[in-house]
């Protein structure tokens, strides 16, 4: 697949981007609009959406595409149903589910609000939008087309590298991102007969408002295990994602460490990226993982001992 770049044509298409008031959602909107792909930005705050649309139009005045927005809290199922009815004439070809938020804390420090927002923002926003969108497509099949005659659509879900390697500090976030990976596998099986392509993205650290917020609550032990981080620019992250989609990959990482960690959890149903090399790396990881895990657990125990003394 790596030599082909014709698997994700966007010119003349319409993309619905959920979680597009900031971060990677905006970066993707810019990339797509630049490629003459009409975009519909979705988020909860209208003023932010209006601001982003104005910036994108000013940045790419040559684009012939349309850009608009829809205000919706997609963690609410009924609002998702309303969303699809509102944008019905557009009938998006591509759906990006980018909404997400991490609040890194020790489990004992999480609040009820933290836990509920983790479920709402990181999981319900995805399953609600995809489910209502698919049901909407089925209800619009007034010509009684056979599943294989449905128009081609793409669904791109955003998980995280922490779904490959969950560790201390991410209990509010990582389990939901693992759920997104599982959901992508099931959707690929259930929606592909209807001409849906389902892709799961596992981004590493990239520059965004969310990344800056994470640093405010991230425990020291989490930072130590994570190691020094040099987040890539958000627009570079978006470029990599679209490039990998174009090459036909349906399991996408945005940096080497993400690809490496993904090798440790190849599984049965997950699509692969440079699969032969992943098998080799997976074998190596299986040998060194117990050693690495011993050091991680040692550091965690020492961290709690230090905290107790203080």
From Swiss-Prot:
Alphabetical GO biological process terms: 3-keto-sphinganine metabolic process; sphingolipid biosynthetic process
Q: State the SUPFAM superfamilies in the record.
A: NAD(P)-binding Rossmann-fold domains
Keyword tags: Endoplasmic reticulum, Lipid metabolism, Membrane, NADP, Nucleotide-binding, Oxidoreductase, Sphingolipid metabolism, Transmembrane, Transmembrane helix
Q: What happens when the gene is disrupted?
A: Leads to an accumulation of 3-oxosphinganine in cells, and decreases levels of inositolphosphorylceramides. Sensitive to the IPC synthase inhibitor AUR. Abolishes filamentous growth and impairs pseudohyphae formation. Not essential for cell viability.
**What topology does it adopt in the membrane?**
Single-pass membrane protein
> What stretch of residues is annotated with the motif GXSXG?
19-23
User: What's its EC?
Assistant: 1.1.1.102
Binding of NADPH, residues:
19, 21, 23, 44, 48, 73
| Active site (catalytic residues) | 159 (proton donor), 173 (proton acceptor), 177 (lowers pka of active site tyr)
Which CDD domains does UniProt cross-reference here? KDSR-like_SDR_c
**Which reactions appear under catalytic activity for this entry?**
sphinganine + NADP(+) = 3-oxosphinganine + NADPH + H(+)
The regions listed as transmembrane in this protein's record are: 276-296
Its predominant location is: endoplasmic reticulum
One molecular function GO term is:
3-dehydrosphinganine reductase activity
The places in or outside the cell where this protein is found are: Endoplasmic reticulum membrane
Question: Any idea which positions bind NADP(+)?
Answer: 16, 24, 73, 173, 177, 208
Which pathway, per its entry? Lipid metabolism; sphingolipid metabolism
Q: What are the record's GO terms for cellular component?
A: endoplasmic reticulum; endoplasmic reticulum membrane; lipid droplet
**UniProt record similarity statement:** Belongs to the short-chain dehydrogenases/reductases (SDR) family.
Query: Could you tell me what this protein does?
Result: Catalyzes the reduction of 3'-oxosphinganine (3-ketodihydrosphingosine/KDS) to sphinganine (dihydrosphingosine/DHS), the second step of de novo sphingolipid biosynthesis.
The name under which this protein is listed is: 3-ketodihydrosphingosine reductase TSC10
């Amino acid at each position: 697949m790596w030599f082909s770049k014709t698997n994700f044509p966007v010119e003349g298409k319409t993309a619905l981007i959920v979680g597009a008031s900031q971060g990677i959602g905006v970066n993707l909107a810019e990339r797509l609009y630049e490629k003459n792909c009409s975009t519909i930005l979705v988020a909860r705050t209208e003023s932010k959406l209006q601001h982003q649309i104005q910036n994108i139009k000013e940045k790419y005045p040559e684009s012939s595409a349309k850009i608009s927005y829809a205000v919706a809290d997609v963690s609410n199922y009924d609002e998702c149903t309303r969303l699809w009815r509102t944008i019905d004439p557009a009938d998006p070809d591509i759906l990006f589910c980018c909404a997400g938020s991490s609040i890194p804390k020790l489990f004992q420090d999480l609040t009820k609000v933290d836990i509920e927002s983790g479920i709402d923002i990181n999981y319900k926003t995805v399953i609600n939008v995809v489910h209502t969108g698919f049901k909407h497509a089925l209800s619009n099949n007034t010509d009684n087309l056979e599943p294989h005659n449905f128009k081609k659509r793409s669904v791109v879900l955003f998980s995280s590298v922490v779904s490959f390697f969950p560790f201390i500090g991410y209990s509010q976030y990582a389990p939901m991102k693992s759920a997104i990976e599982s959901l992508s596998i099931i959707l690929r099986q259930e929606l592909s007969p209807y001409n849906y392509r389902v892709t799961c993205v596992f981004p590493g650290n990239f520059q965004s408002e969310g990344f800056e917020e994470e640093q405010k609550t991230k425990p020291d032990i989490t930072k130590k295990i994570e190691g020094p981080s040099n987040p890539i620019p958000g627009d570079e992250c978006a470029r990599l994602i679209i490039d990998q989609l174009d090459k036909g990959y349906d399991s996408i990482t945005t940096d080497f460490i993400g690809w490496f960690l993904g090798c440790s959890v190849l599984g049965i149903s997950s699509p692969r990226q440079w699969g032969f090399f992943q098998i080799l790396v997976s074998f190596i990881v299986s040998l060194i993982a117990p050693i690495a895990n011993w050091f991680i657990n040692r550091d965690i125990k020492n961290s709690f001992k230090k905290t107790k003394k203080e």
